Amino acid sequence: MSKPTDQLYYANGVDSYIAETHAWRTPETCSTYMLKYVKKTDRILDVGCGPGTITVGFPKYVPEGEVIGVEPSQELLDKAEEALRKEETLKKEKINNCSFRLGSIYKLPFPDNTFDIVNTHQVLVHLQDPVAALVELKRVTKPGGYVCCKEADLLSACVYPKEYEHDLLLQSQARINLHGTNPTAGRSLRGWAIDAKYVAENIHSSASTWCFADEETRKWVSRLFIQRVLHSNERLDDDDAKDQSLRKRVAEAWQRWKEDSRGCFFMTDGQIVYKKEE
């Protein structure tokens, strides 16, 4: 059996237009479901940390602990280091407990039972073998510690008015068809965890929703995805001519939707918090 690939999402290299659509993520916008489990002395591991904007938001919650972000891409780690240098809260409060490591989610460079909190955000959705990844996340978690995972469920996406739905969801569909993204990761999380030998009664499952509807958020999300569809290396079709035509069509649809006061886009994320048996 071939070894699973770490980085399907950036298989063709890190793309700044894709990374920008991830850079708005922070613990406060994306990880509130797990913050109540965090203690000020905890060691947190953020696996698949991407551009690091969630990772660098954790240190203020663990001023007496430590935060480490892990990525298999040095290019993304460079972006994460830049995010760390820019984090004003850490400078102001003189917190210096965050670092980054190159590593694979399938073989994390840490001993067993090392971290109090092990976190992933929109990582398993892109993996060939999420169950193997969950086994490894649990391995490095201390007994009594927590594995926290949040993953999008792309098939839950809804767009209104209906006239925009097909074109606005073409990017998600292309990630499913061409880039290996799992369309039902959010709803699969609990099942994957049980397949990874997590104890069922120790898994707390929940869900949250992204909603882009008011004028400000429509403008913001449209700008990000128009730039992404026009300029990133994320293809919509294998045929060059069709790809260019679809890119233009999707960008125009985002522009029209942005200006439509009826516009609404929402999607569900599945979430699990697993307490490792002591």
From Swiss-Prot:
Q: Name one GO molecular function term.
A: S-adenosylmethionine-dependent methyltransferase activity
Which InterPro entries does the record match to this protein?
Methyltransf_11 (IPR013216), SAM-dependent_MTases_sf (IPR029063)
Output the GO biological process annotations, alphabetical, semicolon-separated. Answer: methylation
**Subcellular location per the Swiss-Prot or TrEMBL entry:** Cytoplasm; Nucleus
CC terms in the record's Gene Ontology section: cytosol; nucleus
Say if the entry is tagged with keyword Cytoplasm: yes
The first-level EC class reads: transferase
Q: Which UniProt keywords apply?
A: Cytoplasm, Methyltransferase, Nucleus, Transferase
Annotated CDD domains: AdoMet_MTases
Query: What is the E.C. number?
Result: 2.1.1.-
Q: Where is the signal peptide?
A: none
The job of this chain, per UniProt, is described as: Probable methyltransferase.
What's the protein here called? Uncharacterized methyltransferase C1B3.06c
Q: Provide the species name.
A: Schizosaccharomyces pombe (strain 972 / ATCC 24843)
Lineage at the top is: Eukaryota, Fungi, Dikarya, Ascomycota, Taphrinomycotina
